[in-house]
Swiss-Prot record:
Region (Disordered): 125-230
Keywords: Cell membrane, Disulfide bond, Glycoprotein, GPI-anchor, Lipoprotein, Membrane, Signal, Transmembrane, Transmembrane helix
GO molecular function: lipid binding
Organism field: Arabidopsis thaliana
Protein's recorded name: Non-specific lipid transfer protein GPI-anchored 23
Lipidation (GPI-anchor amidated serine): S225
GO annotation, cellular component aspect: plasma membrane; side of membrane
Chain's gene name: LTPG23
Membrane topology according to the record: Lipid-anchor; GPI-anchor
Family annotation (InterPro entries): Bifun_inhib/LTP/seed_sf (IPR036312), Bifunc_inhib/LTP/seed_store (IPR016140), LTSS (IPR043325), Plant_nsLTP (IPR000528)
Comp. bias (Low complexity): 138-230
Alphabetized PANTHER family for the sequence: BIFUNCTIONAL INHIBITOR/LIPID-TRANSFER PROTEIN/SEED STORAGE 2S ALBUMIN SUPERFAMILY PROTEIN-RELATED
Length: 256
C-alpha cells in the first residue's frame, strides 16, 4: 500500500503545481475571464483517483492477480462516470513518477469491469510496451565474437602404424631324450613242469602192481646224493615223482 499512497501524494502535488502554473501563465487576463474548468478538472481528477488505489496490485507489471478486485471496479466506474480523461491522466502521471503499469490492462479496465465507457486515451505504443518488453541486450554475443575462440581441430599427428611385432618364437627343440627300449633280459627258461598227473593211480591194479614192483627196488635202493651240478628243475621233478609213488602205494594198500 505504500506505493499507492506515494502515487496519490505525487499526483496531488502535480495537479496543484499544474493549477498554479496555469494561474501564473495568464496574468494579463482579468480574473473574471480566466478559464477555470481545466484547473478544477485536474483537481477533481486527483480527488477521484483515490478510488482506484486498489487497482495498483492488478495493473502493476509482473502482477499475478488474475482479475481486479470488486473495490477496484467500483473505483474505475466512479472515475469514468466523472470524466473518462481522468483515467488517461492517471496513467500519464504514474508513468512520469516512475511507476511501471501495464497500459494494456489499464485501457481494458472498462471492459473488465463491465463499464460501457471508452476513455480514448492517446497512449503511445512504445511507452506502453517498454515495461513489458524484455531489456535490449547489448550486442556482446555477436557471431564474430561467438566464433572468436577458434578451436583448432588440428591435433598432434598420431602415428597409426603399430609397432613391429616380432613373430619369431624361440626355437623349440623337438628332439626328445632317447628312450631306451631295451628291456631287461627276462629268463624265458621256466622250470620244467612235469605233466605227469596222478592219473596213473586210476590205472588197472595189474599195472599198478607191476609198477610198484618195478619201482620198489628203486625206492629201496638208496638214492644217489645229488650232485651240485643238478639243476633245480631236476630236483623238483624227482620230488614230484616221489610224491606220486607214495600216493600210488598208499592207494594200493587201501585196496588190499
Amino acid at each position: 500500500m505504500k506505493p499507492s499512497f506515494v502515487l496519490l501524494s505525487i499526483v496531488l502535488l502535480l495537479s496543484s503545481s499544474l493549477s498554479d502554473a496555469a494561474d501564473f501563465g495568464s496574468p494579463s487576463q482579468p480574473p473574471s475571464m480566466a478559464p477555470t474548468p481545466q484547473p478544477s478538472n485536474s483537481t477533481d481528477c486527483s480527488s477521484v483517483i483515490y478510488s482506484m488505489v486498489d487497482c495498483l496490485s492488478f495493473l502493476t507489471v509482473g502482477s499475478t492477480d488474475p482479475s481486479p478486485t470488486k473495490t477496484c471496479c467500483v473505483g474505475v466506474k466512479t472515475v469514468l462516470n466523472y470524466s473518462p480523461k481522468c483515467l488517461c491522466s492517471a496513467l500519464e502521471s504514474s508513468r512520469e513518477m516512475g511507476f511501471v503499469l501495464d497500459d494494456t490492462k489499464a485501457l481494458a479496465m472498462p471492459k473488465i469491469c463491465n463499464v460501457p465507457i471508452d476513455p480514448n486515451c492517446d497512449v503511445s505504443t512504445p511507452a506502453a510496451s517498454t515495461p513489458v518488453s524484455p531489456p535490449v541486450e547489448s550486442p556482446t554475443t555477436s557471431p564474430s565474437s561467438a566464433k572468436s575462440p577458434a578451436i583448432t581441430p588440428s591435433s598432434p599427428a598420431v602415428s597409426h602404424s603399430p609397432p613391429p611385432v616380432r613373430h619369431s618364437s624361440p626355437p623349440v627343440s623337438h628332439s626328445s631324450p632317447p628312450v631306451s627300449h631295451s628291456s631287461p633280459p627276462t629268463s624265458r627258461s621256466s622250470p620244467a613242469v612235469s605233466h605227469s598227473s596222478p592219473v596213473v593211480a586210476a590205472s588197472s591194479p595189474v599195472k599198478a602192481v607191476s609198477s610198484s614192483t618195478a619201482s620198489s627196488p628203486r625206492a629201496a635202493s638208496p638214492s644217489p646224493s645229488p650232485s651240485p651240478s643238478i639243476s633245480s628243475s631236476g630236483i623238483l621233478l624227482v620230488s614230484k615223482l616221489f610224491i606220486a609213488v607214495v600216493m600210488v602205494s598208499s592207494f594200493l594198500y587201501i585196496l588190499a
